[in-house]
Amino acid sequence: MFDQHKIEKAVRLILEAIGENPEREGLKGTPARVARMYEEIFSGLQEDPEEHLQKIFSEEHEEMVIVKDIPLYSICEHHLLPFYGKAHVAYIPRKGKVTGLSKLARVVEGFAKRPQLQERLTSQIADTIMRRLNPIGVLVVIEAEHMCMTFRGVKKPGSKTVTSAVRGLFRKNVATRAEAFSLIKGQA
């Protein structure tokens, strides 16, 4: 459950702890703005992304389906700083059972909009698709830049973290996996 009042109090305390005056003109509304922002960027905590995959269609298609370059924005749970990038989702329908393409993007967003680790995010997307659609295989790749590596600490802007989760036929069959990676890279 989202507690806007508690977040506002916490932001006020942080501002005081860094030596700022939360009552000065530029900061007066900041605790409320931050609370509203957190409600938006952590909205995935209020949903079950699997629900986006309830609608399944029967099609004469048992070949690879890829939705690539899905923009994603999340918050690293270690420093509460953003990471952002792209998700690529591939699956091979079993017996022609497909879902709407936008539903795959909604699953990505539902898991991204919460405190996250990129590795977990990648697996959660793949496991949810595998569980709900029961496809022959699923492959998820996420490429993201982490502000905790860009803005602080090691300060390496432009560095990207790439994670993958490979399930079913994509894990078992090297050629199928290679085809998916090639299509994701745009080398079809």
From Swiss-Prot:
Pathway: Cofactor biosynthesis; 7,8-dihydroneopterin triphosphate biosynthesis; 7,8-dihydroneopterin triphosphate from GTP: step 1/1. It comes from the Bacteria. InterPro entries: GTP-CH-I_C/QueF (IPR043133), GTP-CH-I_N (IPR043134), GTP_CycHdrlase_I (IPR001474), GTP_CycHdrlase_I_CS (IPR018234), GTP_CycHdrlase_I_dom (IPR020602). It comes from Pelotomaculum thermopropionicum (strain DSM 13744 / JCM 10971 / SI). It catalyses: GTP + H2O = 7,8-dihydroneopterin 3'-triphosphate + formate + H(+). Pfam families: GTP_cyclohydroI. Disulfide bonds: none annotated. It is an enzyme of class 3 (hydrolase). This is GTP cyclohydrolase 1. Homomer. Its EC number is 3.5.4.16. GO terms for cellular component: cytoplasm. Zn(2+) binds at residues 76, 79, 148. Keywords: GTP-binding, Hydrolase, Metal-binding, Nucleotide-binding, One-carbon metabolism, Zinc.
